[in-house]
A protein has these predicted regions:
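Short, Lys/Arg-enriched N-terminal segments with co-localized hydrophobic residues
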Residues: 1-4
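Hydrophobic helical h-region of N-terminal Sec-dependent signal peptides
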Residues: 14-27
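Sec-dependent signal peptide cleavage junction
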Residues: 24-42
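Surface-exposed loop/turn elements that mediate protein-protein interactions on large endomembrane-trafficking
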Residues: 39-54, 80-101, 136-154, 188-205, ...
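Beta-strand-rich domains and repeat architectures in extracellular enzymes and scaffolds
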Residues: 48-78, 116
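Repeated scaffold domains used in trafficking and secretory/extracellular systems
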Residues: 57-64, 108-119, 158-171, 209-224, ...
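Residue position within the beta-strands of beta-propeller blades
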Residues: 72-73, 126-128, 176-178, 229-230, ...
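Short glycine/acidic-enriched loop and turn motifs that connect beta-strands
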Residues: 76-79, 130-135, 181-185, 234, ...
Length: 358
């Protein structure tokens, strides 16, 4: 028992050292942007459409469509790529710092690309056993020269419920983000900063903390310049950029409006809707179903009986992540594959081997 306690203490110290190395300096990316919202961010991006729909059954890789370009990242390796659909070129843009690409790192699908030629996304780093720390933050990558900058990094204990929360939005050349911090009794913060991570400002701490602690099973969405707190029932609060709190009625209508505006797709559990079609990934092996909402006609467009599959619906394209087991237990091959919206393969973008025993 003494040996176990000693090892746990060592592990927590290592996590704290890692957090210091990473630097706690503050930001976070949220869901993808629509054309109208992107235009309000930068005049240079008026002609760009950013689409990044709901991920179906996976959280370990990220992708976003910007016009004819697909920006995507791979879990564990830390690489960020750009695939040009028209030119059929696949370019490696950057590799994340060593500290944030260990075997326990994964990246959220909530990301932005081509805002002043920058790619923003959030990553998580789990450190330690069940009582270890969970670190999270926003990484910004210059898509022209591949330079990487950590805009925000925070660590909280993952041993208490609910798990630490971290959400963000980019609106009118500002990043608005909300996060939790603590080890046993979380405090919640709603803050803002510039796109380069400067001028960080806490908008609300007391009001947001009170709401999140009082609303059972609370969750947060950051939409434009406000944070929304909700649960699965009928409690829905909004705190704006001035820190003013209001309670919102008609939860379903408001919630759906926010989700559509921040993702470009209607999100409903493990489903995504885009241009009159509903996509649903079913089963542990990833069976991708496409349904015509108007006619009710549905069809399985991608599936496998021998490997695990998950999908990111990007609109005209779908990014497929295939996880195929090897002969040796714990080893597998990961392949990121681009599909058209009918589920047919366009190209294998990137593949790599993973050993879960390490």
């Amino acid at each position: 028992e003494r040996w176990m306690k000693k090892n746990k203490m060592k592990e927590r110290i290592m996590c704290l050292v890692l957090a210091v190395m990473l630097g706690i300096s503050g930001i976070i990316p949220t869901a993808p942007v629509l054309k109208t919202e992107a235009a309000s961010l930068s005049a240079a991006d008026d002609s760009q459409t950013v689409i990044g729909c709901h991920r179906l059954h996976d959280t370990s890789y990220a992708a976003v469509q910007v016009g004819n370009k697909i920006y995507y990242s791979s879990d564990r390796t830390g690489y960020i790529f750009c695939y040009d659909v028209k030119k059929k070129t696949n370019k490696k843009l950057a590799k994340l710092p060593k500290q944030v690409r260990n075997k326990n790192t994964y990246y959220s699908y909530k990301n932005y690309a081509n805002i002043s030629n920058m790619f923003y996304y959030k990553g998580y780093l789990y450190c330690g056993l069940m009582d270890g720390l969970m670190c999270y933050g926003i990484i910004r990558v210059n898509v022209k020269n591949g330079k990487v900058k950590k805009l925000f990094f925070e660590c909280s204990s993952s041993s208490v419920l609910p798990e630490p929360s971290f959400e963000f939005s980019i609106y009118k050349n500002k990043i608005y983000y909300a996060y939790s911090n603590g080890t046993s009794n979380y405090n919640y913060y709603f803050a803002s900063m510039n796109l380069d991570g400067s001028h960080k400002k806490v908008i609300s701490q007391k009001a947001l903390t009170k709401v999140c602690r009082n609303v059972k099973d609370s969750r947060m969405i950051v939409y434009r310049d406000a944070v929304y707190v909700y649960n699965n029932f009928d409690v829905f609060y909004k705190i704006n950029k001035k820190g003013k709190k209001t309670k919102i009625k008609n939860l379903p209508k408001t919630y759906m409006k926010v989700k559509v505006s921040t993702s470009g797709c209607v999100i409903d559990g493990e489903k995504a809707q885009y241009k009159g079609y509903e996509y649903d990934s079913m089963g542990s092996f990833g069976l991708l179903n496409k349904k015509n909402i108007a006619t009710g006609e549905e069809k399985v467009i991608n599936s496998s009986s021998s490997e695990r599959r998950s999908y990111i619906v990007l609109g005209d394209y779908i990014l497929l992540r295939k996880n195929k087991a090897k002969k040796k237990l714990g080893e597998c091959k990961i392949t990121l594959q681009l599909l058209n919206n009918k589920g047919k393969k366009i190209k294998d973008l990137y593949s790599y081997n993973v050993n879960y025993n390490e």
